């Protein structure tokens, strides 16, 4: 009998924010997969290790993806990663693929799941607390009130027009483009808050655009 693939959201950073279902799923999977060269480079693995015992006893697959927008390169990588996971599924082993935040929000996992399911294997998404929800809680404010609109925007693409939308905006994937993001925010006179490494020991809170750094490391 083939194993099953789980895309497990480990939340934004604090292990205590992981859901009970996420913890139980990881405990019951003999194989852990991370989107990095190895577990020592995966923030998601570090988070899960903070609450799931005996993580080091599990087999770990380091399945990194290139930081590029080239779809051909990415699709080739997704296929390769999926094949590595399928090998374990064919051995009858369940695999937990760990993602930061929630697997349904800008996660590599979803592309892998589509390939795995297309090949006839079972897969399931285990939700996690999205980073922007944790950030709003940390700042002590809501993301949207009453009739306010809320927009999630990928900052590694052009954000100028998106920032003109009504309502509040969540800017994600800004790490390597932070200097460009700051420039646009200043040009449009936008107010913004930012939390780096929310819920982690290295957490930093920035209360204005001027306080924000020019770049932060890309999370894995």
Question: What role is predicted for each listed range?
Answer:
Residues 1-2, 24-25, 89, 97, ...:
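Solvent-exposed alpha-helices and their adjacent loops that cap or buttress functional pockets
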Residues 34, 59-64, 125, 145, ...:
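Structural signal for conserved beta-strand scaffold positions within catalytic alpha/beta enzyme cores
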Residues 5, 163-220:
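A contiguous loop/helix-start segment that scaffolds small-molecule binding in enzyme catalytic cores
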Residues 39-41, 68, 130-133, 200-202:
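Short gly/pro/ser/thr-enriched loop/turn and capping motifs at secondary-structure boundaries
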Residues 104-165:
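Class I SAM-dependent methyltransferase SAM-binding "motif I" and its flanking Rossmann-like core
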Residues 78-86, 142-154, 212-220:
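A polyampholytic, Gly/Pro-enriched intrinsically disordered region
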Residues 73-82, 138-141, 164-168, 206-212:
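Short, surface-exposed amphipathic charged segments that create phosphate/polyanion-binding patches used
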Residues 1-15, 20-121, 211-213:
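Class I S-adenosyl-L-methionine
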């Amino acid at each position: 009998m083939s194993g099953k693939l789980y895309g497990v959201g480990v939340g934004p950073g604090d292990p205590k924010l992981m859901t009970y279902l996420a913890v139980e799923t990881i405990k019951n999977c003999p194989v852990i997969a991370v989107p990095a060269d190895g577990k020592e480079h995966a923030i998601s693995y570090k988070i899960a290790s903070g609450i799931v015992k005996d993580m080091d006893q599990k087999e770990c697959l380091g399945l990194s993806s290139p930081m590029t927008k080239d779809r051909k390169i990415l699709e080739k990588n997704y296929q390769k990663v999926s094949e590595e996971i399928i090998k374990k599924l064919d051995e009858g082993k369940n695999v937990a693929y760990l993602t930061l935040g929630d697997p349904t929000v800008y996660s590599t996992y979803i592309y892998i799941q589509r390939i795995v399911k297309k090949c006839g294997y079972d897969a399931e998404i285990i939700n996690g607390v999205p980073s922007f929800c944790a950030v709003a809680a940390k700042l002590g404010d809501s993301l949207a009130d009453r009739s306010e609109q809320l927009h999630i925007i990928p900052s590694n693409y052009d954000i100028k027009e998106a920032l003109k939308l009504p309502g509040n905006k969540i800017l994600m994937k800004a790490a390597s483009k932070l200097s460009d993001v700051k420039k646009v925010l200043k040009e449009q006179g936008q107010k913004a808050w930012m939390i780096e490494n929310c819920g982690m020991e290295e957490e930093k809170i920035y209360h204005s655009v001027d306080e924000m750094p020019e770049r932060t490391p890309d999370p894995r």
